[in-house]
Amino acid sequence: MMRLLAIFISLFLFFPLSAQKKEISQARSDIKNRNNLENAESSMRELLKDSANKENIKIYITLADAIKTQYEIINEKFYLNEPADTAMFFNTLRKMFIAYESLDSIDMQPDKKGRVKLKHRKKNAEYLSRYRINLYNGGIYFVKKNNFNSAYDLMDSYIRCKIQPLFSSCM
């Protein structure tokens, strides 16, 4: 009887992990194919709502990559002079910065021996520092549109970059 109970418990513990891996895999596939990016983002955000996943760096990486790809698609449209939503461009940029800051905070967590190994910081900081000025430009854009809440959010993100540990090597 105890053996049967142990089997059931292990099965119930295994199925959520399997579903989580499947969602991450599907999201990565969507990112690679550059489609269903909003679904990939929302599924990663749903996984992060579960307290068991708060420390899973793979989810944060996938979330950041989904938002990064959304931003790059809109950015490509601007460079190709195709119609694109400017407000969405700047809001996606802000979401991207927030996602990478969250990823960095998880990356900074010490391991079991108390050591901190920053695997992603340098690459992410270099990538984001190229687009930091667009936070400022987005703030100006929203001021001109009289959307002061969004302008404040973007300007605040621009200024906070100076104190974010993620950007300590770039500034």
What are these regions (language model features)?
Residues 20-88:
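Start-of-domain marker
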Residues 54, 66-145, 153, 160-170:
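Short coil/linker segments at helix-helix boundaries
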Residues 1-29:
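Bacterial Sec-dependent N-terminal signal peptides
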Residues 30, 36, 43-47, 60, ...:
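Alpha-helical solenoid repeat scaffolds, predominantly canonical TPR units
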